[in-house]
Amino acid sequence: MLKHDQFWHYACQLYSNKQMEEVLLHFQNAHNKNVNLCLLLDYLTELGKQLSQADVEALILCAAKLDQQLLSPYRLLRRTLKDEHHAYPNYASARSSLLKAELELEKLQQHSLIELVNTCLPSHNTGANNLALYLPESLVHQFMRAKS
């Protein structure tokens, strides 16, 4: 069983690398890929756990549902604040509050993804490469370069 807090710690550590942050945001904005799913698939690979294509498809659906219901509208709200209300005297405080809430929504998405993975039966495989089931090969290479 995967633990939510261990994955959160792994994801935060990886995302704190500026190059990794840029690559993941590029995947999200230019290729419509989910950052949390990329991080989770890499985490599982690090643990030597290989998912099936069907498992990854289920994770994609789970992430997409939460993106549609919660994260995308929230990101739009944050961008609107930045683009149209940056002159508001308490802009910095409002933006900080929105970012904090968005981070909680990211945690919620990670929690849901971990819960779903815990229902799967990943095989043990020291050569696991879960990202290859989600990203084109060129993006997998970009991810791995940013990680190293």
Q: Model regions: which residues?
A:
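Long, charge-dense
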Residues: 53-87, 94, 100-101
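Non-catalytic, well-ordered alpha-helical scaffold segments
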Residues: 5, 34-41, 57, 68, ...
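Amphipathic alpha-helical segments within well-ordered protein domains
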Residues: 25, 41-45, 60, 78-82, ...
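A charged, amphipathic interaction segment
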Residues: 81-148
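Acidic, glycine/proline-rich low-complexity segments that act as flexible tails and inter-domain linkers
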Residues: 8-14, 18
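Short alpha-helix boundary/capping elements
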Residues: 32-36, 44-49, 67, 103-106, ...
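N-terminal intrinsically disordered, cationic/polar leader segments
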Residues: 23-26, 72-76, 108, 127
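N-terminal interaction modules that seed assembly of large macromolecular complexes
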Residues: 20-59
